[in-house]
Amino acid sequence: MTPQDRPLVSVIVPSFNLGRYAKETIDGVLMQTYNSLEIIIIDGGSTDETLAVLANYPSIHVISEFDNGPAEAIMKGLRICSGEFILFQLISDGLLEPSWISKCVNELQKHPEASLCWGLVRRKEESGELAELALLRWEKTDPPNEAGMFISWLTYGSGFHETNMIIRKKVALEIVLSFNLPNSKDDIFYYFTAEFHARGYISRCIPIVASYSRIHSNQRSFDEMFNKKLFNYEKIWRRKLWRIRRKVLLTTKPHRFIDSNGAIVGMLELSIKSRAIFLVKIILSSTRLRLLNLMVTCKRRIPLLRIFVNYFRLSIGR
């Protein structure tokens, strides 16, 4: 594939008052070995140094106006972008692997049945020190592909890493612009993952650490994120998760997998034994998750519970 034949990748970057990280994030994109890029910054009306930093990059497209959070910013970026593939990049996070975009485009062209490519994420302290993987489960084993990732989502309910996933624009538009979220400040990526799997699209994972997710002072603490993100959003995206679980476990109708054009590329049918094993895994995962939520809620009152919180985080891969 010559540089002239490379499909355009649109990098959509939501931003708000995190200018101290903007240069590092943008430079990480510009240093990619893949050069057929369009960078779109959707800024929510920052009042810090963000716009001054962005002014040093005349080649990027910047829109700065009030919005209701990352979900609205992403929707806005999708409506104006021109790329065949989409990469979402939060302004406080960045890419670690300089050939990541090239690897993803090659993977998606090699596997036309797949609609999304993603990789691992390592947390990054505000000091710049790299920490553990964002999902501890993948410290022990490589993430699965295609039907295996669908099963993993059904079991654990966790999504793709939004800081490095590259999606076919057609699929991103179909899913994201169909959302009717009760509050556009909600975490759009949990809804995206649920809708992606419910519609039958499949993904590919390149099992390398591709990006980092920064832990900073403006970010919600783990306690707040866990309580809010994993349980308050349950009314919408976990309801969809349980609906698909019931479909797979209780009906004989197979779950179909489709490509970005809607063509069927596979089916998932489980034997009675496999359904029973799968059900036990779901029950264990859900029980551990709810127990961890209870411990997180109580740990400030009972310091000893901190030990058990850390244990259960490891046991469920959070």
Regions found by a protein language model. Name each.
Residues M1-G28:
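N-proximal low-complexity "stem/linker" segments adjacent to membrane-targeting elements
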Residues D27-S36:
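Short, acidic, metal-binding catalytic loop of nucleotide-sugar glycosyltransferases
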Residues S36-G45, I63-F66:
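Short beta-strand/loop segment that forms part of the nucleotide-sugar
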Residues E65-C81, G94:
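Glycine-rich, basic loop-to-helix element that forms the pyrophosphate-binding segment
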